[in-house]
């Protein structure tokens, strides 16, 4: 797949339901998520705004910048959220056939973002590891439908 086309799969307005796992960062439960994403810089970057609501109240907000690098299958994710964790470096990513997969690393551990696509739906799974990637814990799973 052409790299810009992979990023373009996320472009649009999306809404869906999420299942948040109980983790060391907080209680689990259902949530409603939505994101708006658009291509920029000639299709080499995707700008995303994400909002999560729990019990009808704003929970997590994030801004993300996805980029397609100069090399084949070279992607990066810059993630900024309302929890205050700014990235020291971008998360490297790759396209594995039907999914965009990114691995964020910080002193707190590692988090995988796995975006899977089908028709007009997108699934996002977040998983965290606190032992260098030996064991992974679910953080969130969301299924989103394109609304525009």
Model feature map: region roles:
Residues 1-148:
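Hydrophobic small-molecule pocket/channel-lining residues, especially in calycin-type beta-barrels
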């Amino acid at each position: 797949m052409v790299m810009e086309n992979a990023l373009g799969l996320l472009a649009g307005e999306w809404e869906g339901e999420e299942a948040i796992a109980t983790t060391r960062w907080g209680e689990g439960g259902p949530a409603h998520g939505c994101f708006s994403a658009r291509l920029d810089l000639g299709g080499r970057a995707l700008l995303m705004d994400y909002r999560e609501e729990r019990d009808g109240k704003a929970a997590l907000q994030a801004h993300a910048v996805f980029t397609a690098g100069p090399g084949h299958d070279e992607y990066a994710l810059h993630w900024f959220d309302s929890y205050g964790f700014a990235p020291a470096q971008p998360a490297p990513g790759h396209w594995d056939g039907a999914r965009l997969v990114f691995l964020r690393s910080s002193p707190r551990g590692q988090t995988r973002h796995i975006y899977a696509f089908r028709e007009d739906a997108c699934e996002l799974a977040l998983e965290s590891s606190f032992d260098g990637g030996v064991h992974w814990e679910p953080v969130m799973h969301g299924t989103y439908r394109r609304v525009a």
